[in-house]
Amino acid sequence: MKALVTGGAGFIGTNLIKRLLSDDYDVVSIDNYSTGKKENHQDGCLYYDYDLSYNYVRDDGDRYDVIFHIAALARIQPSLLDPMDNIKNNVLSTLHMLEYGRSKNIPIVYAGSSSKHHAPYGSAYAWSKWSGEQLCQLYNECYDLPTVICRFYNVYGPYQLLDGAYATVLGIFERQYKNNETLTITSDGKQRRDFTHVDDIVDGLVKSGMALLGEGNSVISGQEFELGSGVNYSINEVADMFGKDYPREYLPKRKGEYDKTLCTDMNAYELLNWRPDRNLEEYINNFLEDNDG
């Protein structure tokens, strides 16, 4: 089996490639390294460096069995500062991958976002990811291209970014804790998030890809799967896990943020036999043990 992973040098893409290689896939990555890192490269994967917002996909003559389209400029705040760059990158790269998949009849698993449920017009990022979903459904219905949409909920885990505009909440807290810095929290910290470990996300992606390639794929093609833990925590509760008395600083509320994310759709449970089994508190406890020694 041969898989193409876009965004393969980034947070989720790197974890996905590690899993695919362990499952004996041949893997090729495309990444423009805007947030991906070459130190994330995995032995056994072939990496290409170019921008998918341009209509070009390198083709060495080998047909891929499945495409995992993970590449995107993520995060709400950077997209508010530069909406054109975010929309150009996210929408055009998705359109180009779908057209490539259509030309070769290659199934595509698309990385969606739970922001679709909250404020699809609240930021360029949310709109661009929602628009990508619409393009997937268009190509599925008009051109019979097998597609699956997997929506992510506040992903955390190995290879997450620890600083900069694209860092995750957990990544920022981890960096601040390691450096004995105050934890920074936007707004009042009461906003709740469904945090999902990247290994669970990867498991959902791989199961989606396998389902598209297996018998009965007509049931799977066109589906939208919510990949969330089904449990949410306030940011204050997450900060408490690093120590109830650990210092924290509250920053002004930011535009585009929403009050709650929570996965309640069990479609992935029923059709993919997917279950999230990683626990946020256990993850943070392990982090503290590793860094308090």
Q: Which residue ranges define each predicted feature?
A:
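N-terminal Rossmann-like NAD(P)+-binding domain of SDR-like oxidoreductases, especially those catalyzing
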Residues: M1-V155, Y177, L205, W274, ...
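Residue-level marker of alpha-helix boundaries and capping positions
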Residues: G7, K88, A126, G164, ...
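Gly/Ser/Thr-rich beta-alpha loop segments that engage phosphate groups in nucleotides
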Residues: A9-I12, K38, S114, Y159, ...
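Acidic donor-diphosphate engagement hotspot in glycosyltransferases and nucleotidyltransferases
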Residues: L16, P120, Q160, D200, ...
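Short, surface-exposed alpha-helical segments at coil->helix boundaries
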Residues: K38-E39, E133, G171, N232, ...
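Short aromatic-enriched loop/helix-cap "lid" or pocket-rim segments at secondary-structure transitions
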Residues: K38-H41, D60, Q160-G164, V198, ...
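C-terminal substrate-binding subdomain of Rossmann-fold SDR/epimerase-dehydratase oxidoreductases
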Residues: D51, K178-G293
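NAD(P)-dependent short-chain dehydrogenase/reductase
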Residues: A124-A126, W130, Q134-R193, V198-G209, ...
